[in-house]
Regions:
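Nucleotidyltransferase catalytic core that binds NTPs
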Residues: 2-160
Length: 160
């Protein structure tokens, strides 16, 4: 594995670690990168598989500007994810990451990347359908989003 020296990004540390560098440099994490618009049981199911194996999760929220497909700010999304996992006592760290789309992210700096393809029987959950269901005042979406964050999702979508 090659090592690349990089200057510390103080903005990242300030936003994600209160200005302090992380002390978890030797800890291995299962890393999940996404938009989470909103965070739903499909996301939770994948992450829970790693947590059940005793592997802590690092959930990285892509730092994107809100738009029709992304109605929640990065900060709102992070708070919802933190709220859910705090209610469960999960070993989860949530942080933002600059917007990326390449699955190759991290390979160039020597990280070991193990891609995970979810099993086909896990089902497909569409965040777009969840947002549309809320806009249409249809409660079908409630079976797809954990009760601990449902009120936040509705409030943020209806008060934007």
């Amino acid at each position: 594995m090659k090592t690349i020296k990089m200057k510390p990004n103080k903005n990242w540390e300030k936003k994600n670690h209160g200005g302090n560098p992380t002390s978890n440099e030797s800890k291995k994490y299962a890393i999940f990168i996404g938009r989470y618009q909103p965070y739903h049981y499909g996301h939770i199911s994948l992450i829970q598989q790693k947590l059940d194996q005793g592997i802590p999760a690092l959930i990285l929220v892509r730092d994107i500007k809100p738009d029709e497909k992304n109605p929640f700010t990065t900060e709102q999304t992070i708070k919802m994810i933190q709220k859910y996992h705090a209610s469960k006592g999960d070993d989860v760290t949530v942080a933002f990451i600059p917007d990326i789309e390449s699955v190759n992210y991290g390979r160039g700096v020597g990280y070991e990347i193990n891609e995970f393809t979810p099993p086909k029987d896990i089902g497909f959950i569409s965040a777009t359908k969840i947002r549309e269901s809320i806009e249409n005042k249809n409660d079908d979406w409630k079976s797809l989003v954990d009760e601990s964050i449902q009120e936040d999702v509705v409030n943020l979508l209806t008060n934007k």
